[in-house]
Amino acid sequence: MKRILVFLLAVAFVHALERGRDYEKDKVCKDLASLGREDFTSLSMVLYSRKFPSGTFEQISHLVNEVVSLTVTCCAEGADPDCYDNRTSALSDKSCESNSPFPVHPGTPECCTHEGLEKKLCMAALKHQPQEFPTYVEPTNDEICEAFRKDPKDFADRFMYEYSINYGQAPLTLLVGYTKSYLSMVGSCCTSPNPTVCFLKERLQLKHFSLLTIMTNRICSQYAAYGKEKSRLSHLIKFAQKVPTAHLEDVLPLAEDITTILSKCCDSVSEDCIKELPEYAVKLCDNLSTKNSKFKDCCQEKTPMEIFVCAYFMPASPNPELPDVKLPMNKDVCDEGNTKVLDQYIFELSRKTQIPEVFLTKILESTLKSLDECCHSESSTACLNAKGPQLTRELSSFIQKGQELCADYSENTFTEYKKKLAERLRGKFPDATETDLQELVAKRSDFASKCCSVNSPPLYCNSEIDAEINTLQS
């Protein structure tokens, strides 16, 4: 662990390099000296793979080589005082060339219209959208060792690249720590007399680390997609659907706490930050274990992290018989200092409504935006009274269509779901050919498999929901 901590000292280098601030040069050079060239290169591979997940291995490698060369040259004794600034400027200029060997970003052309420090700042601010569908598949033990023995450095670089582009939303401390631990395992097991036994033992040791990295990548991806306010809304909806027998006072602090943790930790390099997750799991049990039998079962897991994972994947519970929920249209919705009226409405609607969170977050964002516009109009009361019926109709229509798109999915196996879906579509389109029907079943079931579960990826599903709802209307 001490080695990992030292490894993380160089994180500041990337920020300094991208910002082009000379005052950080001394710190960069000290970090490089304490880290050594090999580990500095490894860290750069993780950082830039994470920053440019659509880049190829060759593109990331080119960039890493340039970064390492720049650092070593400009930190050498007797180096030109302008070396650092000149080389970082040249690096950003090279990124703008049409035949640049570096990874590209959709925002790169805009950055390239700027000059000097402004260009570097623009490049540094570029971020890719989260990878919502990781594709990394771990090779077999034999394949791992064959590649490792052939070229240990190439194996390490490719693993760090593959793992980082797939799980790059995990906090940097976890991502770096896990990749280093994994490579240490490979180095030990591929040179041991019995690799199979070694891998079995070492993977067991790494299980918690691996789970934590993968889980934080998932929740931080959702946070990156939603932002702080929508993330709070999303978690409130999920808790209301998972534990509909709870009260708002039970779940609202949990939704706010997890949002705060993610806002602090997803981009943090502090090791202490992620320790808040196990503490949060304990609070989950304190608030909800007596409200729901499935939650109570989750709280029987051995470790806080296992409790958190269990709660995360827990499906929505059957909703109890509840009265209809009316969209609040009085002046209380405009009280920015008191969100309880809207929070109560969101909670009541969510625990009564059987459609996935991505659907509710999508329509509620639009509804809340319309309410906010009324609150900032000349006559908020008149605006609310005028828009209220229309918003209620739109909300009801959207929920109905969402229920149609996801009908039968959560209650059945995928095979049974497809059978029921085919029956429903056959009844809805009696004149459709068998080929057309099969294509429609395949398309709709693929949509359901990605967007009809409790933790569906928001970026992907946001546009897909619109497309599928349009097919219902056509």
From Swiss-Prot:
Gene3D superfamilies xrefs: 1.10.246.10
Function as written in the Swiss-Prot or TrEMBL entry: Involved in vitamin D transport and storage, scavenging of extracellular G-actin, enhancement of the chemotactic activity of C5 alpha for neutrophils in inflammation and macrophage activation.
Protein's UniProt name: Vitamin D-binding protein
Signal sequence coordinates: 1-16
Albumin domain: residues covered: 17-208, 209-393, 394-474
Pfam families reported for this sequence: Serum_albumin, VitD-bind_III
Lineage: Eukaryota, Metazoa, Chordata, Craniata, Vertebrata
Disulfide-bond pairs as recorded: C29-C75, C74-C83, C96-C112, C111-C122, C145-C190, C189-C198, C220-C266, C265-C273, C285-C299, C298-C310, C334-C375, C374-C383, C406-C452, C451-C461
Gene name of the encoded protein: GC
Location of the protein in the cell: Secreted
